[in-house]
Amino acid sequence: MGTLYLVPTPVGNMEDMTLRAIRILKEADLVLCEDTRTSGILLKHFEIKNRLMSHHKFNEHASSAGIVNRLKAGETVALISDAGTPGISDPGFFLAREAAANGITVQTLPGATAFVPALVSSGLPCNRFCFEGFLPQKKGRKTLLESLADETHTMIFYESPYRVVKTLEQFAEVFGTERQVSCCREISKLHEESVRGTLEEVIAHFKETEPRGEFVIVVAGKEKVKSSDRKKQTDKKYNV
């Protein structure tokens, strides 16, 4: 049996690539990637001369069986995404599941992912959080947001610059305009920036300043009602 490695790649700065990731990509019998053109630039930068094969959301179900067979035959396969950690809003889950189901060793290297630095630098609680990634663009979007209306943990979303304002406005409708939010863009790149404030304030900012780059939006959870406050509300309700 071979080993399937899920290898994180930089989300911005090439210096975020780990030594172990470079070694695994050099030693692997096959490197799977979303886009051979994008990953080809990465491999060339680190002088990794290895074969690339496309493995993306449109072909992962069809190609996984053949990859599993190669792993069963003893090959070492490395999976990378265009940026970040495979499986986090990127292809990776299906192949990892199929490999594990067939008794193949699956190892994920620690490394770059966009939401962790955005969360930690947001100034919002990061001891407990829920990662939502990209919201559905149409079907189920409103239902999903409404299901998060009473979520008390910090929430994390990915968004493109073209939909940031619309998404923030939808957040304001569901969570209220005073909910705290941090919008982090261009993580680990030259123009990295975090805009923090209430939803109302951040919406106003991006209506005046055109959003650019990929965004991680970190939203505060709903404040828990203290037991003493809950008792007061109950007493008031029943005129105690």
Where are these regions (language model features)?
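Class I SAM-dependent methyltransferase SAM-binding "motif I" and its flanking Rossmann-like core
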Residues: 94-151
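Glycine/small-residue-rich loop that forms an oxyanion/phosphate-binding "nest" at active or ligand-binding sites
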Residues: 56, 64-113
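Conserved helicase motor
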Residues: 54-61, 134-136
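Glycine-rich, flexible N-terminal cofactor/catalytic loop recognition
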Residues: 1-57
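Loop/turn-to-beta-strand initiation segments
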Residues: 3-4, 74-78, 154
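A contiguous loop/helix-start segment that scaffolds small-molecule binding in enzyme catalytic cores
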Residues: 154, 158-240
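A charged, well-structured terminal subsegment
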Residues: 70, 140-156, 174, 225
